[in-house]
Curated annotation (Swiss-Prot):
This is Phosphatidylglycerol--prolipoprotein diacylglyceryl transferase. Its main location: membrane. The chain crosses the membrane at residues 17-37, 59-79, 94-114, 121-141, 176-196, 201-221, 231-251. Pathway: Protein modification; lipoprotein biosynthesis (diacylglyceryl transfer). InterPro entries: Lgt. GO terms for molecular function: phosphatidylglycerol-prolipoprotein diacylglyceryl transferase activity. It is a multi-pass membrane protein. Catalyzes the transfer of the diacylglyceryl group from phosphatidylglycerol to the sulfhydryl group of the N-terminal cysteine of a prolipoprotein, the first step in the formation of mature lipoproteins. It is an enzyme of class 2 (transferase).
Length: 262
């Protein structure tokens, strides 16, 4: 059995000043968005629209707002609505933790819609640009989860099981690593190559929704359900139920918009 190293939450300390690992992972996610985004805007579709690096910066700013606001509101609505109805001011205490990927996704979609309107283009043109950049950013986020020793997995006796001393001494799935590799690295590589070929507007976005939904749905079988929710209908977690519409909508987009040259 492996033991989680219990990293210092701060990656860098200078006197009373500290840069935490999770903040550093967010920074890395933003940097990779801009670096890979430079490559994405070279595609003929975006060159024809006159996309520039400044567009990427504006898009990143809008996306960050969407992630933070949507992620927090999604967590309060999907996971702990009763608690936050009784303690509404707690919604604003982001530093205490509590973010939802699915809520963050809805926030980003709203930001992309606003950005598309501002730039007088279509929503899926923007979302197709962004989709291949998201998984690698998620990988950094899951690495931050692992370093912090949070979002651990269910008990297991597999050889690579890991105990997380912050919770107990039970050997568990290192589910953060599963998600890092699945919805982060593997999905990112597959989506990058898929988006590199001629696709109809909307198909790349559909591939992301389908791919993420499947990866997250499967990873949830290894991840410990939230203690305050447990498992819901059909023995599925909240995360799995939220992935179901993603999967079906992803299939819809990929099959509705048939392949067409850019």
């Amino acid at each position: 059995m492996l033991i989680h190293p219990q990293f210092d939450p701060a990656a860098i300390r200078i006197g009373s000043f500290a840069i935490h690992w999770y903040g550093l992972m967010y920074l890395m996610a933003f940097v990779q968005f801009l670096l890979l985004g430079r490559l994405r805007i070279r595609a003929p579709r975006y060159q024809a629209l006159g996309w520039t690096y400044k567009y990427l910066e504006d898009l990143l700013f809008a996306g960050v707002l969407g992630v933070v606001l949507g992620g927090r509101l999604g967590y309060t609505l999907f996971y702990m609505p009763g608690f936050y109805l009784a303690n509404p001011l707690g919604i604003f205490k982001i530093w205490e933790g509590g973010m939802s990927f699915h809520g963050g996704l809805l926030g980003v979609l709203a930001a992309l819609y606003w950005f598309a309107k501002k730039r007088k283009t279509t929503f899926f043109v923007v979302s197709d640009l962004v989709a291949p950049l998201v998984p690698f950013g998620l990988a950094f986020g899951r690495l931050g989860n692992f370093i912090n020793g949070e979002l651990w997995g269910r008990p297991t006796d597999l050889p690579w099981a890991m105990a997380f001393p912050l919770v107990d001494s039970v050997p568990r799935h290192p589910s953060q690593i599963y998600q890092l590799l699945g919805e982060g690295v593997l999905l990112g590589i597959a989506l990058w190559f898929y988006a590199g070929k001629s696709r109809r507007v909307g198909q790349v976005s559909g591939f992301f929704l389908l791919g993420y939904g499947i990866c997250r749905f499967l990873a949830e079988y290894a991840r410990e359900p939230d203690a305050f929710l447990g498992l819901l209908g059909l023995g599925l977690s909240m995360g799995q139920w939220l992935c179901v519409p993603m999967i079906f909508f992803g299939i819809y987009l990929m099959t509705t918009f048939k392949s067409k040259s850019k």
